[in-house]
Amino acid sequence: MYPDYPYFAVAITRTCGSGGGSYIGKQLAKAFDIDLYDRKLLRLASEDSGISEELFARADENTRKTMLYRVSERVYDGSIIPPESGNFISDENLFNYQAKVLRELLNEESYICVGRAADFVLRDKPNVLTVYVDAPYDWRVEREMKRQGIGSSQAKHYIDKLLSLIHISEPTR
């Protein structure tokens, strides 16, 4: 631990079905007795901004991976669009509020964050551990089948669709 940084964060990125968030993230949070932020971050960003949590959730669903990673490549610089602007509820500004909350939380508590481009948002912080969780494709398909109660072809379609949103394709199987 760095003496100037009493808190730490673990930023988990993962492939769909790997268990990175639903299992590993939860286990780490439990072991360290700290909060796990995933969709919970939307509520905090809503409280911070005064923007409806539903708008954050809608933007999150609409932009899922592509927007988060496109915006996050510039890394949050502290700028937030003011309420009087027509772009106040733009996807970029909603992302900026989430990034702002992630950075501010690091001054208040240790936490685990799953997704939310936290690895990019917090990459300049020395007290952040970034973890990437992956698993074999067939294992992830099995996991999604059980988690969602769906068949193999549906699980494959679901995983492949999410991967296509971030322009990643599975190696030839």
Please state what every model-predicted region is:
Residues 1-7:
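Extreme N-terminal, non-catalytic leader segments
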Residues 7-11, 110-112:
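Residue-level preference for the first positions of well-ordered beta-strands
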Residues 12-26:
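Glycine-rich phosphate-binding P-loop
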Residues 35-46:
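Short beta-strand-centered segment that lines the nucleotide-binding/catalytic pocket of NTP-utilizing
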Residues 46-110:
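ATP-dependent small-molecule kinase phosphotransfer cores
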Residues 97-148:
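ATP-dependent NMP and nucleoside kinases share a basic, alpha-helical "lid"
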Residues 152, 159:
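Glycine-rich phosphate-binding loops of nucleotide-dependent enzymes
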Residues 164-172:
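Residue-level detector of conserved catalytic or cofactor/ligand-binding positions
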